[in-house]
Amino acid sequence: MKTLWKHCHIASMAHGKYSIIENAAIVTSGALIEWIGPETELAEPEHDNCIDLGGAWVTPGLIDCHTHTVFGGNRSGEFEQRLQGVSYAEIAAAGGGIASTVRATRAASEDELYASAERRLRHLLKDGVTTVEMKSGYGLDLENERKILRVIRRLGNTQPVTVRATCLAAHALPPEYADRAADYINHICNDMLPALAAEGLVDAVDAFCEYLAFSPAQVEQVFISAGQLALPVKLHAEQLSSLGGSSLAAHYKALSADHLEFMTEDDAVAMAAAGTVAVLLPGAFYFLRETQLPPMEALRKHGVPIAISTDLNPGTSPGLSLRLMLNMACTLFRMTPEEALAGVTFNAAKALGMSATHGSLEVGKVADFVAWDIERPADLAYWLGGDLDKRIVRHGVESSI
């Protein structure tokens, strides 16, 4: 079915720029874009439907390329404790922190995890998100990592959103492997990844490279195993210290390296050469009251693509609005609104290996877009909170969220 979407202005985000088309129209055929351009250049079309967008600004559907949406439990009590002066170490010693989320996730049924994740996902969808990545990493054994990944697949099959599933078994050390990190990494590589990949539950593999998680050498083992399974890799790197994780990610042609507050210019050079995307997570930076900024000038100087994401998770970034992250990226990291919008469209698609089909409005790409009732594209990064009036189109069909 062909649909003409007319009377709009378009920020197509082609090549990662606004790439504005004034007084524009889009023709979709099924789930794909068949034509896009100034309305005056549109030949008399044959179409089944004609939809007037009322002068709206149209952007690609937003892409949240780094989330931990599926988890059990609630850590708002820890948030309150920290603000009362209890240290993270004290909370962890009492069984809190990520360990509490692992316990709650293991205890939850698949249906319970689905129900709670679906509620969180709905907030993202209402913000204009049409594609989202979700990670495992709160199960930390084969049974529970499988359970999380099954929930992620189920969300993609039942909700009006494209979902990419990432296995983050190398997120933290589970209690049964205390002081045995090498054994756990071997278990991930020899048992968990092959089984989960064989079941079709994994689109990419991630790890946490940090002094309080896994070493570069241990992460490299995971990357080698992922490569043997033909799975692309991603990496949490340089959030709290500089271990060279982002350069390691670049060496293995990772889709992305994420966080990056402590990365060096040499890391930026390596990432640029590899085409590895820098995924910045301003929500975690804000929530943890960090002070070490990502090296924005080095990223720009060397042409590293920059994406933005919510990092939605229970411990360090309980963020339910990707649009709020646009403002945070501009305010905290001094990104421009154009850079920030590219970070949740064009470059976010790159970070998921989806740039051939998603991330910009171009002929042949998937017809995922949002028609916003705004005065200019910068409004998306300008307004703090609220629910901007919008119409969301996914695969060429208007969604009601």
From Swiss-Prot:
GO molecular function terms noted in the UniProt entry: imidazolonepropionase activity; iron ion binding; zinc ion binding
Record: residues binding Zn(2+): H66, H68, H236, D311
Binding site for 4-imidazolone-5-propanoate: R75, Y138, H171, Q239, T316
Binding site for N-formimidoyl-L-glutamate: Y138, N313, G315
Enzyme class: hydrolase
Needed co-factor(s): Zn(2+); Fe(3+)
Keywords of this entry: Cytoplasm, Histidine metabolism, Hydrolase, Iron, Metal-binding, Zinc
Principal subcellular localization: cytoplasm
Pfam families from the UniProt entry: Amidohydro_1 (PF01979)
Cellular compartments per GO CC: cytoplasm
Cofactor mode of binding and number, as noted: Binds 1 zinc or iron ion per subunit.
Residues in the signal sequence: none
Annotated Gene3D superfamilies: Metal-dependent hydrolases, Urease, subunit C, domain 1
Subcellular location per the Swiss-Prot or TrEMBL entry: Cytoplasm
Catalytic activity, reaction form: 4-imidazolone-5-propanoate + H2O = N-formimidoyl-L-glutamate
Top-level division of the source organism's lineage: Bacteria
GO-annotated biological processes: L-histidine catabolic process to glutamate and formamide; L-histidine catabolic process to glutamate and formate
Enzyme Commission number(s) from the entry: 3.5.2.7
Pathway terms, separated by semicolons: Amino-acid degradation; L-histidine degradation into L-glutamate; N-formimidoyl-L-glutamate from L-histidine: step 3/3
Record family assignment: Belongs to the metallo-dependent hydrolases superfamily. HutI family.
Known function: Catalyzes the hydrolytic cleavage of the carbon-nitrogen bond in imidazolone-5-propanoate to yield N-formimidoyl-L-glutamate. It is the third step in the universal histidine degradation pathway.
Protein name: Imidazolonepropionase
Annotated organism of origin: Pseudomonas savastanoi pv. phaseolicola (strain 1448A / Race 6) (Pseudomonas syringae pv. phaseolicola (strain 1448A / Race 6))
Source taxonomy: Bacteria, Pseudomonadati, Pseudomonadota, Gammaproteobacteria, Pseudomonadales
